[in-house]
């Protein structure tokens, strides 16, 4: 069975979609403007959730729309494995990072995705149970 996509190109997608009340084309253009503003590398946090996926999509489209000669700085996508998620979620995130690296390489986009894991003595469970840290809440984070 052949896959059917709603949009034939990323340009068509940017023209048609609205995100948080703004045209996707505008958000991609704003990300592109910020990318070209200086030479400092970017580090993007990625959890695999809807918010970080949307941000990553906007940045990827901005880099894709940037002429190759202007893709002058690196973008690092970092996904931190908290060792709390289920194997299914961890594998989905790892798969997304692998696909992202492959596509960025194919399209000559200066973006690399990385999966990081804490040392065992710095894991969520070691901090919570071993060191006695209080559990994170909406108003308290480690």
Residue ranges of model-derived segments:
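ATP-dependent adenylation/nucleotidyltransferase module used to activate substrates
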Residues: 1-142
